[in-house]
From Swiss-Prot:
InterPro entries: PPPDE_dom, PPPDE_sf. Its main location: cytoplasm. The gene is desi2. It is found in: Cytoplasm. The active site is at H29, C107. It comes from Danio rerio (Zebrafish). Its EC number is 3.4.19.12, 3.1.2.22. This is Deubiquitinase DESI2. Residues 4-148 form the PPPDE domain. Residues 172-185 have a biased composition (Low complexity).
Length: 196
């Protein structure tokens, strides 16, 4: 059995936390690290997965407003790396980019759900305290900058997904107008592909 550690990586949205920490509220992003990969979730306006992958603990891939805060070992799992890939892919059906909601379905909700599946443990409550606070102040989500909802790594994934769909449409249009049989090009691997 694998007995692989399940790690919660927490990122500080450092400039806003200078103001909110005195209120006892932090603004945090999180992802789950397993098998040397980190899976996280963010919002975008499209009906495909908002789950993306980054190098564990690398805040630069998320964007300039993020700073790595800490790694918390939540437990361990006997799921294999292939099992984890299937689980994340299946979760992508629920965690679509256009389903992101600050209070009900954010990156921390995803991290907690994945952690529960992998090792039976939720993430610490303090990581997602903003969701509770924003439920008390309903207009808060509309005041937050877009980059809080869509980290840079996810923006890259979305661009790649949309480019792939555009190329598929162009290929389909070209093959429809060409009477000869064409072989579809092999998909290009990308570092930050969204999970379907």
């Amino acid at each position: 059995m694998a007995n692989e550690p399940v790690i919660l990586n927490v990122y500080d949205m450092y400039w806003i936390n200078e103001f909110t920490s005195s209120l006892g509220i932090g603004v945090f992003h999180s992802g789950i690290e397993i098998y040397g990969r980190e899976f996280a979730y963010g919002g975008h306006p499209y009906p495909f997965s908002g789950i993306f992958e980054i190098t564990p603990g690398d805040a630069t891939e998320l964007g300039e407003t993020f700073k790595f805060k800490e790694a918390i070992v939540l437990g361990s799992t006997d799921f294999t790396e292939e099992d984890v890939e299937r689980i994340v892919e299946e979760m992508g059906k629920e965690y679509k980019g256009n389903a992101y909601h600050l209070m009900h379905k954010n990156c921390n909700h995803f991290s907690s759900a994945l952690s529960e599946i992998l090792c039976g443990r939720e993430i610490p409550r303090w990581v997602n305290r903003l969701a509770y606070f924003s439920s008390c102040v309903p207009f808060l989500q509309s005041c937050l900058p877009k980059e809080w909802l869509t980290p840079a790594a996810l923006q890259s994934s979305v661009s790649q997904e949309l480019q792939g769909e555009l190329e598929e449409a162009e290929d389909a249009a070209a093959s429809a107008s060409t009477p000869t049989c064409a072989v579809a090009p092999a998909p290009r691997p990308a570092r930050h592909q969204p999970r379907r």
